[in-house]
Amino acid sequence: MRSLHILLVITASLLASLAVSAEADPSTRTANVVENNKDKSRFLRDGGTTEAQTDEERATITLGDKVVSDKAATKDLLERLLALGTPLKTVQKEFLNMPLIKTFAELSKHPNWRALDKYERMQWQKLNEGQTLTYMRVGDRSYSKEKAQEQLLRWVAQKKTVKSVYDDLQIEGFARNTDAARLNWRAYNMYDKWFTAASQMQRNPQQYAKFGTGYHSEQKTTEVFEKWAMEGTHIKSVIKTLNLNNKSASEMANNENFPALLKYVKLYLDFKPFRDLNAKSRLQARRPIS
């Protein structure tokens, strides 16, 4: 308890000094927080776009209107609090200066919401070591972050509207503190970014994708992708080939290879009947003739 008190004092002092420093010297002022999540009803657009949001993984700590703790510093603080076994409500109230009795929709507007959400996930992973953290749930099916990304990419390739995904992920329950909305909000934000990026994509057909030996034209890329799709090369492998692995949703959406990834996902889906037919033919060929 004494260790927690000392950490609280140090943190409060650090945040206050950083805030004063940023206010006193404009040259050292940190960037303002990118507009936080608004009430999810504002994102109801039937195939439309949404304003850019801060990335779901980039938790920071804010005091007033200044970011006073970057991603790395925030992670370090949260790890220290986790090691001390600090309760979630204590982190929320004492370290993140967030009200305790609020709906998810109201809390999501607070600049420290992502830091709170990150700490909650860190707590779960510590208590459930070795288990995969559920990132998205649709109906009775649960998805890890990797599998959720693949499913969301499929929906983008199929041009599934933001409104439809909003409904499937039950985000309307955010204001009622439903478990589904609380779990799925990151996946919804990820889809919103990708759908928006897909609707605005423009690529040079002569330098359509960069992989392997360098840039390839759209025609060459399509030829290679069709071969891979026919062979059943998994989407995860192509994400790695296009150097899109280990990137946030925003980084992927802004990457020059994102249009190519969506092209492959579409081809992968389109070629599934042919892969299934080939698999059936190979199975029949292996059966002994009676």
Curated annotation (Swiss-Prot):
The keyword RNA-binding does not apply. Its main location: secreted. Residues 36-45 have a biased composition (Basic and acidic residues). Residues 33-56 are annotated as: Disordered. Residues 224-247 are annotated as: W3 motif. Keywords: Glycoprotein, Host cytoplasm, Host cytoskeleton, Host nucleus, Secreted, Signal. Glycans are attached at N246. It is found in: Secreted; Host cytoplasm; Host nucleus; Host nucleus, Host nucleolus. Residues 151-174 are annotated as: W2 motif. Residues 249-270 are annotated as: Y motif. One of its GO terms (cellular component) is host cytoskeleton. A motif (RxLR-dEER) lies at residues 42-58. Secreted effector that acts as an elicitor of hypersensitive response (HR) specifically on plants carrying defense protein R4, through its interaction with this protein. Belongs to the RxLR effector family. This is RxLR effector protein Avr4.
